[in-house]
Amino acid sequence: MHHTGLGSGVAKRVLLASPRGYCAGVDRAVIAVEKALERHGPPVYVRKQIVHNVHVVGSLEKRGAIFVDQVDQIPPGAVTIFSAHGVSPAVVHSANERGLQVIDATCPLVTKVHREVIRFSKAGYFILLIGHSGHEEVEGTSGHAPDRVLIVNSPDEADTIDVPHTDKLVWLSQTTLSVDETLETVKRLRLRFPHIQDPPSDDICYATQNRQAAVKKIAPLSDLVIVVGSANSSNSVRLVEVALENGAKAAVRLDYADELDPALLDKVDVVGVTSGASVPEILVRDLLEVLARAGYTKVESVQTAVEDLVFSLPKGLRESRK
């Protein structure tokens, strides 16, 4: 084991995971709010947080975006953006009843799962949706066939979940889960329901998979892994878990560099750094500066994939992407 501890004389260094940070769906959603503010002027209303990041939401609020929990808090007729996490048909119906001018910033990879729910439920399937109850994405997805969807929160739940009829059964998932934990959940579902069908393609999205793969690469080499991301960001929280499961001696999540407890760096030679899919790169740069001041001036990039996916903007904003 080439792990180096106290007094080894090995230079302190940072392993910077790549890919990290913004995914295509987040980029599109944030630009949608910015463009809507440019085009319509403030206020522009957003149902829920546009993406699960404290910094992004705060900076858009300063520019005139108003974040609300439900559409009934929005004045009739106002410009309204649905967040990247997607909405149920019931929310769309409420928005239409209020005459809201809707811009739908749902990530296309979430919409794909919505379409799977619609297709499988129409074909008479019962759907086991692997995901976290109460998460906005899961609420939106399950809302497309509420009486045909059961949510499976964990591998343990797969062992006990009560399924009404099992002749036509399929599993789907939230886009931001731990790949390994989801495989374990599916394995256990299959033990109980051998004929359960798989989704037509991966529901866990490319960005979630890529960020987890990059963390797996740096984790075994790191004394500490720092994940930049917010507490309500499912994919960021998963990165901490994945780091710990793959050999990181310690792992923490923080929103801002100044939240880093210097005591965490005690006896630490190698710091792994990554960020969740809704995190602007400036927050990672701030962290690297704080680490440099603490002696971690050497930064090595560890790249496991190249991402070049870009989504076109939501309807109503398309011709103006810059």
Swiss-Prot record:
Keywords: 4Fe-4S, Iron, Iron-sulfur, Isoprene biosynthesis, Metal-binding, Oxidoreductase. (2E)-4-hydroxy-3-methylbut-2-enyl diphosphate binds at residues 52, 85, 135, 175, 233-235, 278. It comes from Tropheryma whipplei (strain Twist). Catalyzes the conversion of 1-hydroxy-2-methyl-2-(E)-butenyl 4-diphosphate (HMBPP) into a mixture of isopentenyl diphosphate (IPP) and dimethylallyl diphosphate (DMAPP). Acts in the terminal step of the DOXP/MEP pathway for isoprenoid precursor biosynthesis. The lineage of its organism: Bacteria, Bacillati, Actinomycetota, Actinomycetes, Micrococcales. Pathway: Isoprenoid biosynthesis; dimethylallyl diphosphate biosynthesis; dimethylallyl diphosphate from (2E)-4-hydroxy-3-methylbutenyl diphosphate: step 1/1; Isoprenoid biosynthesis; isopentenyl diphosphate biosynthesis via DXP pathway; isopentenyl diphosphate from 1-deoxy-D-xylulose 5-phosphate: step 6/6. Belongs to the IspH family. The keyword Transmembrane does not apply. Its cofactor is [4Fe-4S] cluster. GO terms for molecular function: 4 iron, 4 sulfur cluster binding; 4-hydroxy-3-methylbut-2-enyl diphosphate reductase activity; metal ion binding. It catalyses: isopentenyl diphosphate + 2 oxidized [2Fe-2S]-[ferredoxin] + H2O = (2E)-4-hydroxy-3-methylbut-2-enyl diphosphate + 2 reduced [2Fe-2S]-[ferredoxin] + 2 H(+); dimethylallyl diphosphate + 2 oxidized [2Fe-2S]-[ferredoxin] + H2O = (2E)-4-hydroxy-3-methylbut-2-enyl diphosphate + 2 reduced [2Fe-2S]-[ferredoxin] + 2 H(+). It is an enzyme of class 1 (oxidoreductase). Isopentenyl diphosphate binds at residues 52, 85, 135, 233-235, 278. PANTHER family: 4-HYDROXY-3-METHYLBUT-2-ENYL DIPHOSPHATE REDUCTASE. GO terms for biological process: dimethylallyl diphosphate biosynthetic process; isopentenyl diphosphate biosynthetic process, methylerythritol 4-phosphate pathway; terpenoid biosynthetic process. This is 4-hydroxy-3-methylbut-2-enyl diphosphate reductase. Binds 1 [4Fe-4S] cluster per subunit. The active site is at residue 137.
